[in-house]
């Protein structure tokens, strides 16, 4: 008898759960025929008519054909900043005061998934409005680390899929088509196979997937600059010597942190020679944007490979990039994400923050 009652109870529970699941699924699709199509960004909210930045040969130029160099900073993921009550116009005003003409938004897949695209678009919309009001540009960065063709990634915060990545750029390029403030789409932050731990990187596959992403973007908007990274965590561009990405209007990204180059003798010329051979050469034929760079002392906050340096890196990398018209965006304007540019939310500069602030203000 006891067994019969237990079995009956289980059957009732299973029935109730099945009904709940069916009704819950129904609530998600109820009235699906009335769900509107996605909308584009309302440009009437913008106060400045900014020039589109375009690719001309190996340079970035404005609409008058004048060479344009992006000089700016990375902020933390906007969702992180919003959660910490630091997402505001005043943050962008501080960046403008430092001399930045561009802000990179590192959008992590986990952050995008947590919010959903409609909610995250509200955050990006705010960035567009604030940046436009201050005549600054934006780089939208799909901030994943790993090897997308194999869908293997360095940490759960970077986990994504090919489908999600394509959908992200499809939706972003549709929403912000024709918005000059968003100048650059960085297709994938740092491709790496982690020494084979995330599969085996193959340039042909990586080249193909980037070309397909660019085709999706260009189908919606041809007024943006697709930015493509090389292997070794966005450091090695040597494969493009023989097999460049076969699309027009593109630029290449590099993250030349100090410990990436490892000369036997640490002289300026030896660093220059190594940088030139691995990524600097690309600036002869294409625009190059160093979308992450920076350093921290060995005993500094968050010191880790490959960003540790005694400070000699700063002047050297700036000289190298200036000689080649390479744009640059420092990591990171946040007191926690190392190498940090600020010590606190009073915007007290760190060692590298002080150095790069002087560099930025030379071009205000």
How would you label these PLM feature ranges?
Residues 1-4:
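Positively charged n-region of N-terminal signal peptides that target proteins for export
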Residues 8-18:
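Bacterial N-terminal signal peptides
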Residues 21-102, 358-360:
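N-terminal carbohydrate-binding accessory modules
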Residues 52, 84, 156, 166-184, ...:
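Extracellular glycoside hydrolase catalytic/binding regions
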Residues 64, 68-89, 112-116, 153-157, ...:
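Acidic/histidine-rich helix-loop elements
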Residues 77-79, 109-113, 146-148, 191, ...:
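Feature marks short, surface-exposed loop/turn motifs that line or immediately flank catalytic pockets
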Residues 83-102, 106-107, 113-144, 150-187, ...:
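An active-site-proximal structural segment forming one wall of the substrate-binding cleft
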């Amino acid at each position: 008898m006891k067994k019969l009652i237990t079995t009956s109870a289980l059957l009732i529970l299973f029935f109730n759960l099945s009904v709940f699941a069916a009704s819950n699924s129904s609530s998600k699709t109820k009235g699906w025929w009335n769900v509107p199509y996605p909308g584009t960004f309302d440009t009437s909210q913008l106060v400045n008519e900014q020039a589109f930045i375009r690719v001309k040969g190996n340079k970035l130029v404005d609409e008058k054909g004048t060479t344009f160099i992006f000089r700016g900073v990375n902020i933390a993921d906007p969702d992180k900043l919003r959660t910490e009550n630091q997402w505001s116009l005043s943050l962008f005003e501080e960046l403008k005061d430092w001399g930045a003409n561009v802000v990179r938004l590192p959008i992590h897949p986990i952050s995008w998934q947590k919010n959903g695209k409609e909610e995250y678009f509200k955050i990006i919309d705010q960035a567009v409005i604030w940046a436009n009001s201050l005549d600054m540009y934006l780089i939208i960065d799909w901030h994943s680390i790993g090897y997308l063709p194999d869908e293997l990634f360095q940490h759960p915060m970077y986990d994504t899929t090919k489908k999600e990545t394509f959908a992200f750029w499809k939706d972003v390029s549709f929403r912000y088509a024709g918005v000059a403030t968003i100048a650059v789409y960085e297709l994938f932050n740092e491709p790496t196979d982690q020494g084979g731990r995330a599969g085996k990187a193959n340039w042909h596959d990586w080249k193909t997937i980037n070309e397909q992403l660019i085709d999706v973007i260009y189908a919606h908007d041809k007024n943006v600059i697709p930015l493509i990274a090389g292997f070794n965590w966005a450091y090695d561009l040597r494969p493009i010597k023989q097999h460049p990405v076969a699309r027009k209007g593109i630029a290449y990204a590099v993250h030349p942190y100090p410990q990436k180059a490892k000369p036997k003798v640490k002289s300026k010329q030896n660093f220059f020679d190594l940088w030139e051979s691995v990524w600097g050469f690309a600036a002869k034929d294409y625009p190059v944007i160093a979308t992450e760079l920076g350093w921290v002392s060995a005993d500094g906050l968050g010191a880790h490979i490959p960003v540790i340096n005694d400070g000699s890196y700063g002047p050297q990398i700036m000289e190298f990039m200036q000689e080649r018209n390479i744009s640059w965006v420092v990591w990171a304007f946040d007191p926690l994400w190392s190498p940090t540019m600020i010590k606190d939310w009073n915007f007290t500069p760190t060692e590298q923050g002080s150095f790069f602030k002087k560099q930025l203000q030379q071009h205000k």
